[in-house]
Amino acid sequence: MDFGPLKEFLEEDNITDISYSNGGQVWLKTLDKGIYQVHRPDINNAFMEKLAFQCSNVMGKTFNMAHPFLDAESAELRMNFVHDSIATNGIACLIRKTPAKIRLNKDKLLNEQYITEQLHDFLVKCVEGHANIMVAGETGSGKTELVKYLASKTKEDEKIITIEDTLELHLDKIFPQRDIVAMKTNNIASYTESLVACMRQNPIWILLSEVRSAEAVLAVRNSISSGHHILSTIHADKASSIPMRMYSLLETGQDIEQFLGSIHRYIQIGIY
């Protein structure tokens, strides 16, 4: 694919997200400066529409007034487009980079006051002790990056299986020498079916990239109740809200006390 003037931003490791909106505004999200706007007249509606149609062709999808939303992905990119029939001030796009690398390390976490040393060392011990951990936060807050970092603290001989609907963790590429199976759910292989297959692979750790559906919630609960250990993420406004947030995603009339009791019993650590 031809990313044209966006290529320089995609090649810059410090940039995590590229947002286009409002007929020509380009916003970058970086690891050190946060979010800021750049002036780039060559990145305009015409260019973004061309890029969207390239993506739709590659993905075998349609992008037009009848199908105004497009999700696309490559090995290390996630892209979302909104057609100008819906985004009335011009086509909108968000590109998120999902590189096969661990961006976090202890020095970075401490220097940027992301975490205290005492808490950092405690979390590492929790991983070493096989605690089940859920990481909560807003979109783009770094949940997946923290999960990748914590996963790097698992033991070398412990088998990991990742189950994702969009590939973001890339642990099989980051640790090519380890016993890691990367599963991607789709219309044919659901979370439930992938989890059943996963259990037969005898993993020590099961990593779900994000819990955002009833099926994913049940996958987490079934994983932890069967004795496996999990690292996963969820959208929640604080750590103590994680159990209720998981319950709110369920579509069936699950008994709330029984469900929350199982979550409190089996998930030892919530991080926000």
Predicted regions and their residues:
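Conserved NTP phosphate-binding and transfer environment spanning the P-loop NTPase/kinase superfamily
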Residues: 264, 268-272
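Phosphate-interacting basic helix/loop segments used at nucleotide- and nucleic-acid interfaces
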Residues: 1-15, 59-67
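Hydrophobic anchor at the beta1->P-loop junction of P-loop NTPases
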Residues: 135-137
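Walker A (P-loop) phosphate-binding loop of P-loop NTPases
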Residues: 140
